[in-house]
Regions:
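Right-hand nucleic-acid polymerase module
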Residues: 1-52, 62-207
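Cys/His-coordinated zinc-finger cores
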Residues: 58
Length: 207
């Protein structure tokens, strides 16, 4: 994450974050272990601070050796340092990275789906629990639409690009981060994706 910003600063902050993320993925120690990634944007609003908190949720697929080789593994502190470097920050940002673990009864697939749902949850300004005035709602929607203008909300990298090609995931990239209460509620069907490790080619392939 980065520090909170005003509505006027949101668009530039999002540009900086996406550029910083691209730099992070190209760092040698990150790139050599990376099989694929899913990057999603989330922006939350603080009424108390009257500011926005732009941040990324990222799902990384790494090589099997990542957790076994000391030279390859990147701990929490090092991820924080790499993100600070990529963003060119003069303060220590907050980075929370965790291994996806299988939940009892759900399996690894369930753990991945559980992790992946957070990046794409919408920010609902019409929720009565938010207690926003009508003027505040209008301002928040305007700030969010302006701040996220021409910003890709979800990005796929490496193996996940192949997954996107083989399955109809274009609607994810065109999703809405701001809910105004006018959308009808519906259900979505899930897809099971199997990536097989090829030892000869040292890479994953979608089956």
């Amino acid at each position: 994450t980065v520090k909170n910003v005003t509505g006027q600063e949101l668009n530039q902050s999002m540009t900086d974050i996406l550029r910083g993320f691209n730099r992070l993925m190209k760092y040698k120690k990150v790139d050599k272990n990376l099989i694929g990634f899913l990057r999603a944007t989330e922006v939350t609003y603080s009424k108390e601070l009257d500011s926005y908190h732009p941040h990324l949720h990222v799902l990384l697929m790494v090589r099997p050796s990542y957790f076994q080789a000391k030279a390859d593994y990147i701990n929490q502190e090092e991820w924080t340092e790499l993100w600070q470097k990529a963003m060119k920050l003069d303060y220590t940002p907050m980075v929370d990275i965790r291994a996806v673990k299988a939940d009892k009864g759900k399996g690894l697939k369930g753990a991945i789906l559980e992790t992946a749902k957070y990046p794409v949850k919408p920010f609902d300004v019409t929720d009565k629990k938010t207690d926003f005035t009508d003027q505040e709602k209008l301002q928040i929607v305007d700030d969010m639409l302006t701040g996220l203008h021409r910003k890709r909300q979800i990005g796929f990298g490496k193996l996940f690009k192949e997954i996107k090609k083989q399955f109809d995931f274009d609607d994810l990239e065109d999703g809405n981060l701001v809910q105004t209460g006018e959308d009808t509620e519906g259900t979505s069907s899930g897809r099971e994706i199997v990536a097989v490790w090829n030892w000869d080619r040292k890479n994953y392939f979608v089956r």
